[in-house]
Amino acid sequence: MAKKQSILSPIIRITFTFLVLCGLVYPLIVTGIAQAVMKDNADGSLIYNDKNEVIGSKLIGQNFTDPRYFHGRVSSIEYKAEASGSNNYAPSNPDLEKRVEKSIEEWKKQNPSVPVTEVPIDLVTNSGSGLDPDISPKAASVQVERISKLTKIPKETLEQLIKDQTEGAALGLFGETRVNVLKLNLELQKLMKQ
């Protein structure tokens, strides 16, 4: 009996010690460092409106359906963050072809003046997460004609807006040149109010 207690005692102490270290101490230290070093990222990269209300995150895409605004990538999960993921069909899968064709048909309805051959692939395909907040600058530019027509904002002004909102690759190495759709639409909204 004494032998069982002598074996059990260190096991319980080690378990409790690691429970406190890994479940309490480590998360508090990491959270503290994140808040000190990169507060915006640690808080979710939230975007606020003029009334200081949270309207979204730079990291999570939103579904813009109003034709006066720039549209982001297609989402198979309807931009529901709790269901992050995508079907990730293989290029040979007929379901992928059907979904892309459906996206192209939607595109043609809203942008009849833009040839389908000019539609960037990121406007008709899903991202891996289904929540991608960014599109390529070209994907933003092909929407300029529609937006200009509906908002009466000159095309040149919209093109400059896209350039102003374009971000380069992270550290000049990782990823591609991109435009955050939410931030772009917020700037567009300011132009529409003028």
UniProtKB/Swiss-Prot annotation:
Origin superkingdom: Bacteria
GO molecular function, one term: ATP binding
Membrane topology: Single-pass membrane protein
CC per GO annotation: plasma membrane
Transmembrane segments: 14-34
Keyword Cytoplasm: no
Main localisation: membrane
Keyword Zinc: no
Compartments in which it is found: Cell membrane
Keywords assigned by UniProt, alphabetized: ATP-binding, Cell membrane, Ion transport, Membrane, Nucleotide-binding, Potassium, Potassium transport, Transmembrane, Transmembrane helix, Transport
Subunit structure: The system is composed of three essential subunits: KdpA, KdpB and KdpC.
UniProt-listed PANTHER family: POTASSIUM-TRANSPORTING ATPASE C CHAIN, POTASSIUM-TRANSPORTING ATPASE KDPC SUBUNIT
Family affiliation: Belongs to the KdpC family.
Protein name, UniProt field: Potassium-transporting ATPase KdpC subunit
Naturally occurring in which organism (per UniProt): Bacillus cereus (strain 03BB102)
Lineage, opening ranks: Bacteria, Bacillati, Bacillota, Bacilli, Bacillales
